[in-house]
Amino acid sequence: MKYPKLVFDVSFDERARFEAKSRGYLSNVYVQQSDGSMYPVVFYDCIRLAQDLEYEVSTGRMCVADIGMIILPEVTLECIKIAVKKLTDEGYFKRVVPRGD
């Protein structure tokens, strides 16, 4: 099996891929490393992140914070795979806490 591996809580079929790209957001995803450790990740594109921040500011919260937030130019499977591979190669996942079961 090739690592890092993407693990989706729900099927990431053609429709889900279209919806993620359209929304600019994807959650309920984990990155599994070769040692079996799983890291929760959330993907945003810049437009969706700006919209969410604008909303949060309007409510007085003043921030957007998600564990494992990764910002992409667009939320596509191709961009997700490239980003996760690069982050793994750079040691990103060694510096964050894996999901506890």
Identify the meaning behind each predicted range.
Residues 1-95:
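Short helix/strand-capping turn motifs
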